[in-house]
From Swiss-Prot:
Classification via Pfam families: CKS (PF01111)
The protein's role, per its UniProt record: Binds to the catalytic subunit of the cyclin dependent kinases and is essential for their biological function.
Protein name as annotated: Probable cyclin-dependent kinases regulatory subunit
PANTHER family xrefs: CYCLIN-DEPENDENT KINASES REGULATORY SUBUNIT/60S RIBOSOME SUBUNIT BIOGENESIS PROTEIN NIP7
SUPFAM superfamilies: Cell cycle regulatory proteins
Subunit structure: Monomer in solution; may form a homohexamer that can probably bind six kinase subunits.
Recorded family membership: Belongs to the CKS family.
A Gene Ontology molecular function term of the record: cyclin-dependent protein serine/threonine kinase regulator activity
UniProt keyword terms in alphabetical order: Cell cycle, Cell division
Length: 84
Protein backbone atom coordinates (compact mmCIF):
# COMPACT_ATOMS: atom_id res chain seq x y z
CA UNK A 1 0.00 0.00 0.00
CA UNK A 2 1.36 3.47 -0.81
CA UNK A 3 2.97 5.39 2.03
CA UNK A 4 0.75 8.41 1.35
CA UNK A 5 -2.56 6.73 2.23
CA UNK A 6 -4.19 5.97 5.56
CA UNK A 7 -4.07 2.23 6.28
CA UNK A 8 -6.69 0.40 8.35
CA UNK A 9 -6.11 -2.90 10.14
CA UNK A 10 -8.59 -5.73 10.23
CA UNK A 11 -10.79 -5.66 13.32
CA UNK A 12 -9.88 -7.84 16.27
CA UNK A 13 -11.96 -8.61 19.36
CA UNK A 14 -12.14 -9.52 23.00
CA UNK A 15 -15.29 -10.08 25.06
CA UNK A 16 -15.98 -6.35 25.55
CA UNK A 17 -14.53 -4.46 22.60
CA UNK A 18 -13.65 -4.62 18.95
CA UNK A 19 -10.34 -3.01 18.06
CA UNK A 20 -8.48 -1.75 15.07
CA UNK A 21 -5.43 0.35 14.45
CA UNK A 22 -4.95 3.01 11.84
CA UNK A 23 -1.57 3.87 10.34
CA UNK A 24 -1.20 7.48 9.25
CA UNK A 25 1.14 8.55 6.44
CA UNK A 26 4.05 10.79 7.54
CA UNK A 27 2.53 14.04 6.28
CA UNK A 28 -0.67 13.41 8.26
CA UNK A 29 1.11 12.03 11.34
CA UNK A 30 3.04 15.26 11.85
CA UNK A 31 -0.30 17.04 12.40
CA UNK A 32 -1.38 14.96 15.41
CA UNK A 33 -1.02 16.49 18.88
CA UNK A 34 1.56 14.84 21.11
CA UNK A 35 0.81 13.18 24.45
CA UNK A 36 -2.99 13.09 24.32
CA UNK A 37 -5.83 11.17 22.75
CA UNK A 38 -7.75 12.60 19.82
CA UNK A 39 -11.43 13.45 19.84
CA UNK A 40 -13.62 12.04 17.10
CA UNK A 41 -13.67 15.43 15.40
CA UNK A 42 -9.87 15.58 15.42
CA UNK A 43 -9.23 12.13 13.95
CA UNK A 44 -11.97 12.62 11.37
CA UNK A 45 -10.36 15.97 10.52
CA UNK A 46 -7.12 14.11 9.76
CA UNK A 47 -8.99 12.01 7.19
CA UNK A 48 -9.63 8.86 9.22
CA UNK A 49 -12.92 7.32 8.06
CA UNK A 50 -14.75 4.84 10.29
CA UNK A 51 -18.32 4.13 11.28
CA UNK A 52 -19.82 5.59 14.46
CA UNK A 53 -18.72 4.49 17.91
CA UNK A 54 -14.95 4.23 17.50
CA UNK A 55 -12.84 5.88 20.22
CA UNK A 56 -9.12 6.67 20.12
CA UNK A 57 -8.28 4.91 23.39
CA UNK A 58 -4.48 4.62 23.69
CA UNK A 59 -1.19 6.11 22.58
CA UNK A 60 1.46 3.84 21.09
CA UNK A 61 4.50 5.93 22.05
CA UNK A 62 7.11 4.00 20.03
CA UNK A 63 5.06 4.62 16.87
CA UNK A 64 2.89 7.74 17.32
CA UNK A 65 1.70 7.52 13.69
CA UNK A 66 -0.35 4.44 14.68
CA UNK A 67 -3.71 5.32 16.23
CA UNK A 68 -5.38 2.67 18.40
CA UNK A 69 -9.18 2.54 18.33
CA UNK A 70 -11.84 0.49 20.07
CA UNK A 71 -15.60 0.38 20.39
CA UNK A 72 -17.92 -1.66 22.56
CA UNK A 73 -19.11 -4.96 21.16
CA UNK A 74 -22.92 -4.83 21.03
CA UNK A 75 -24.64 -7.34 23.28
CA UNK A 76 -26.61 -9.99 21.38
CA UNK A 77 -30.37 -9.47 21.60
CA UNK A 78 -30.80 -12.82 23.38
CA UNK A 79 -28.64 -11.68 26.30
CA UNK A 80 -30.67 -8.48 26.72
CA UNK A 81 -33.89 -10.29 27.58
CA UNK A 82 -34.31 -11.74 31.04
CA UNK A 83 -35.81 -15.23 31.15
CA UNK A 84 -36.60 -16.31 34.75
Amino acid sequence: MPRDTIQYSEKYYDDKFEYRHVILPPDVAKEIPKNRLLSEGEWRGLGVQQSQGWVHYALHRPEPHILLFRREVPMPAASLSHNP
